[in-house]
Curated annotation (Swiss-Prot):
GO MF annotation terms: ATP binding; magnesium ion binding; phosphorelay sensor kinase activity; protein serine/threonine kinase activity; protein serine/threonine/tyrosine kinase activity
Anything else known: Both phosphorylation and phosphorolysis are carried out by the same active site and suggest a common mechanism for both reactions.
Cofactors (names): Mg(2+)
Protein's UniProt name: HPr kinase/phosphorylase
Binding site for ATP: 158-165
Domain notes: The Walker A ATP-binding motif also binds Pi and PPi.
InterPro entries per the UniProt record, alphabetical: HPr(Ser)_kin/Pase, Hpr_kin/Pase_C, Hpr_kin/Pase_Hpr_N, P-loop_NTPase, Ser_kin/Pase_Hpr-like_N_sf
Gene transcribed to yield this protein: hprK
Catalytic site positions: 143, 164, 182 (proton acceptor), 248
Length: 318
């Protein structure tokens, strides 16, 4: 698992929706942002720096701007001295408000990027929080195929050559959608949600033994692919051998941990004559039913228990 960070320059140059313009501190554009939380330093500007989150992006909204611009020069000098005594990665003023010159001077001297945006504070925080959540989410790479089947994101896993790509190709021909083949990039966006995607280089491509590299979007159309998908089920394809024990009732609920999230796991034996794509489709529909609270295996088990209990009573009347 990796915990990536991004440079301040990434926010400035690659996210036009933020509307950022650099005023000072160009030498600090390589400063790293390692957390998705932001900080509004309102209380800190009054002199209370206990628990000051200096390692976050500092956002100056209308309130902070109005406060510092209303101070007399001597007070503002003291505010700046205290504020810039901390190591800061960047400072952003919203609503197009221009910071005082003492902020510009300190940011230039200390190589702290100082930027402004015409976007309102509330909208800006919403936008940048989403960007940081996506960019800084814990992530890992997983060998397999990620495909959307009946709206369920399924990660097909298993040893090389077991038939993952061939199974996915048949599912695509049936109208389902490819997300990633071979290497799946997985990000944890919350405590219980994993998003799978593909690298730009491999996106929409598959490798099939005997055919080579295929462009799925060109062959099957734009409706056969998507860029990312929530991972809700893992299906592990395993070569069938007599000594392996596979679940035959559905009462077991095995899971596999990915980035600290438990994902439902189904182990499917692979051998000649088995129609794996239709098994995957059925697993997807069954998973949708389970999400709605309907579990066929448990219902059948309950019926069986009731039947056996009823038979026991009939054989042993009071």
């Amino acid at each position: 698992m990796s915990m990536p960070g991004i440079n301040v320059s990434n926010l400035l140059n690659e996210h036009e929706e933020l509307g950022l313009r650099l005023l000072a501190g160009e030498k600090g554009l390589t400063n790293r942002i390692n957390m998705s939380e932001i900080n509004r330093p309102g209380l800190s500007l009054t002199g209370f720096y206990e628990s000051f989150a200096h390692d976050r992006i500092q956002i100056f909204g209308k309130g902070e701007w109005a406060y510092i611009t209303s101070r007399i020069p001597e007070d503002l000098k003291n505010i700046a001295a205290d504020f810039f005594s901390f190591h800061l990665n960047c400072i952003i003023f919203t609503h197009g408000n221009m910071p005082p010159s003492i902020f510009t001077e300190n940011c230039e001297r200390l190589a702290i990027p100082l930027m402004i945006s015409d976007v309102s504070t509330h909208k800006f925080i919403t936008l940048i929080s989403g960007i940081l959540d996506r960019s800084l989410a814990p992530r890992t790479m997983r060998h397999g195929v990620l495909i959307e089947v009946f709206g369920i994101g399924i990660l097909l896993s298993g040893k090389s050559g077991v038939g993952k790509s061939e199974t996915a190709l048949e599912l695509i021909e049936r109208g389902h959608r490819l997300v990633a083949d071979d290497m799946v990039e997985i990000r944890r966006l919350s405590e219980s949600y994993l998003i799978g995607t593909c690298s730009d280089l491999l996106r929409h491509h598959m490798e099939i033994r005997g055919l080579g590299i295929l462009n799925i979007k060109d062959i099957f159309g734009i409706g056969s692919v998507r860029d990312h998908k929530l991972i809700e089920l893992i299906i592990r394809l395993e070569e069938w051998t007599e000594d392996k024990d596979f679940d035959r009732t559905g009462l077991e609920n095995p899971t596999e941990e990915l980035l600290g999230v438990q994902i439902p796991l189904i182990r499917v034996p692979v051998k000649p004559g088995r129609n794996i794509p239709i098994i995957v489709e059925t697993a997807a529909m069954n998973q949708r039913l389970r999400k709605l609270g309907k579990n066929a295996a448990q219902e059948f088990n309950q019926k069986l228990s009731n039947y056996l209990q009823q038979g026991k009573v009939e054989r042993n009347p009071p």
